[in-house]
Amino acid sequence: MRSSLSAAALLAALITPLAAQDHADNVAPGGGAVPSGWIVRADRGDAKNAKVASMGQGLHLTLGPAIILYRSDTQGSGPFHTLATFTQTKPSEHAEGYGLFVGGQGLDGAAQKYIYFLVRQDGSYLIKRRDGEKTSDVSKGWVQHAAVKKPDAKGSATNLLEVDNKRDPSKLAFLVNGQEVYGTDAKGMALDGIVGIRANHNLDLHVEGFGVHR
């Protein structure tokens, strides 16, 4: 009995670090670099292992930690529409989400709040609220949808994401590649605030066409 317990304990000790390594943040060479005017906040710790660079007509993100990326002057208030085109340049080891956030408040403190809309490489989308350290579902978890493009034969996927409160101010619509995947009553959604980009850890992304239209 004693030897069997010892073997089990040894196995657990070996498995646990390996499982932790599976979800560890990658090392991003040149991490900590951010174009002027942009602000990066990591979910955990600091953003020294996240690299954001101007590239072509957009931004290129090479990530260790999950982050939000925004400009303090990019606000959505009243009816507005925001969009960006995201190219995941290569598949991640685990399916990780990327997309937009709206209604950002207190983003530099512990009481941060925002609503985020993500897609990921398995062809699904997610909409959630963040309130400090807590998050809650708007959509029913990750939802499969044919509008979300999966990686092609070369391993890359390009998706245009939009959050639209302008076309119908009573409604908040979430679109992928021009197709509405989710819509809800805008009342009570706390939309006023900073609009920006959210990307989970270990992703390599190119972002173009980010903008807010009122």
List the model feature ranges, each with a label:
Residues 184-211:
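Flexible glycan-contacting loops in extracellular carbohydrate-active proteins
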Residues 48-68:
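Short carbohydrate-recognition loop motifs
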Residues 84, 153-184:
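Carbohydrate-binding surfaces in secreted/extracellular proteins
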Residues 64-134:
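Secretory/extracellular carbohydrate-interaction modules
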Residues 7-17:
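Bacterial N-terminal signal peptides
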Residues 1-4:
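Positively charged n-region of N-terminal signal peptides that target proteins for export
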Residues 21-45:
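Extracellular carbohydrate-recognition regions
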Residues 134-160:
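Short, aromatic/His-centered strand-loop micro-motif at the edge of beta-sheets
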